[in-house]
């Protein structure tokens, strides 16, 4: 008798995606990140749903409603810190997932790659709006500074900022609309994830060698379901260690002070996962130039398939390209560190050098290294 998963239309869909999916036999732990991102997304939606039941999106009550969740709601503190630190885990997995795609040449699957970048932008927007909701000092001033960047748009900039704010400053209208978008965006992200997977399953997964996987494939279940469980345990172990031992490690102490439009915090900075982009923004003295550099720091990922000059897909056997890749990764970590430092010497200079190096590595060094390798292998 044919199993139900092969006959029922709905079960067939799940079966082709999670059970009988043909997968390359040699994919490493770096291919676990997709399932971990799915886990993070589900965790964020579930915890967010429970938080929304107790949260009040009103400027006069938002801060105290978060305090109420933490103190009075049954296990409210666990739900709150799972949601806050779950976002950090989400971004760690996202950055590693993108890094894996760059290293092993997965960006050559154009549709999957471009939807992935749209997913990154949607996730960043969701996280930014979520950071505003507790209505602490860093929430308020972070929202003021970042939304103010829209005023750099020529001619319509000021109108655009006031339209986003719903008034002449960040206030109740801003908080309400940010809560609305923060609630709806994860469901849009879920739809984009479905598209991401749809296009991925059209081509099949890449593998570390960067060669065709067609001659040697195995079913996703039980091999990769079992393998993914290890990654899942490591993710949950890290997350629960953060939540139960040091829940505020990645947060900002200023956010425990209620939002006050009359008092500016000494250092306004976003969450750690935006610091690299924030460092690039601050490195350009001109406002419009800074905003463009900020946008390009993410959108430059869309140009990578066009800049791919190598004759091999993966970087596994390309030592020069590996060198440029790890230079870029170290540069990204330096930018993250600089973004959290005050605007003073030597941090300004380091920020400007690393910002320029970020773009040079992607636009010049990586394609040049690939061309040199082609020449050395006599593949020109």
UniProtKB/Swiss-Prot annotation:
User: Which annotated residues bind a ubiquinone?
Assistant: 201
User: Which Pfam family is one of this chain's hits?
Assistant: Cytochrome_B
Q: Which Gene3D superfamilies match?
A: Cytochrome Bc1 Complex, Chain C
**Might you report a single GO cellular component term?**
mitochondrial inner membrane
Q: How is the cofactor bound?
A: Binds 2 heme b groups non-covalently.
Instruction: Tell me where it resides.
Output: Mitochondrion inner membrane
Taking the record's annotation, the residue ranges forming a coiled coil are: none
Q: How does it sit in the membrane?
A: Multi-pass membrane protein
- Give the residues the record marks as binding heme b b566: 97, 196
Beyond the main fields, what else does the record say? Heme 1 (or BL or b562) is low-potential and absorbs at about 562 nm, and heme 2 (or BH or b566) is high-potential and absorbs at about 566 nm.
Function per UniProt: Component of the ubiquinol-cytochrome c reductase complex (complex III or cytochrome b-c1 complex) that is part of the mitochondrial respiratory chain. The b-c1 complex mediates electron transfer from ubiquinol to cytochrome c. Contributes to the generation of a proton gradient across the mitochondrial membrane that is then used for ATP synthesis.
**What protein family does this chain belong to?**
Belongs to the cytochrome b family.
What protein name applies here? Cytochrome b
Q: Which organism is it from?
A: Nomascus gabriellae
